[in-house]
């Protein structure tokens, strides 16, 4: 299977991306309008199965392009997991010329071992305020 990663794909299918994100525990109820707005305000990476022209992965970064960036919504279609696509997706994101010299942040409850392979480490001084 061949796949390609496209940065800031302007021709992505909003329905396909929403469906993919809705398969995750963190975005299972995310509305299409919200997905559209997050894409518009983020640096995004779309992964496509080139044989089927199907969206199979996605990740995005929120940044000021000066100090930090926050990685979020990293997902690979369940059917394609275990093939190294997530690894390649994260490598592409963290090695992006616009981000490589910035501090990367992320929040995960189940993928810590995965991100440690890229140099991420646990930091206990994170605070959160939930939305209303």
Model-identified regions with their sequence ranges:
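Conserved active-site alpha-helix within GNAT-family acetyltransferase domains
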Residues: 102-132
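Conserved acetyl-CoA pyrophosphate-binding loop and the N-cap/start of the following alpha-helix
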Residues: 80-89
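Conserved acyl-CoA
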Residues: 88-104, 113
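Residue-level recognition of the GNAT/N-acetyltransferase active site
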Residues: 77
């Amino acid at each position: 299977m061949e796949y390609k990663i496209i940065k800031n794909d302007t021709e992505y299918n909003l329905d396909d991306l929403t469906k993919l994100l809705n398969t995750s525990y963190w975005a299972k109820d995310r509305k299409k309008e919200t997905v559209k707005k997050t894409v518009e305000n983020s640096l995004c990476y779309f992964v496509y199965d080139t044989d089927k022209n199907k969206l199979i992965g996605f990740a995005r970064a929120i940044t000021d392009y000066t100090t930090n960036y926050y990685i979020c919504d990293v997902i690979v279609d369940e059917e394609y997991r275990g093939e190294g696509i997530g690894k390649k997706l994260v490598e592409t994101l963290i090695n992006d010329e616009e981000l490589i010299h910035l501090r990367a942040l992320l929040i995960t409850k189940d993928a810590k071992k995965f991100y440690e392979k890229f140099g991420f480490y646990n930091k206990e001084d994170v605070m959160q305020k939930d939305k209303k």
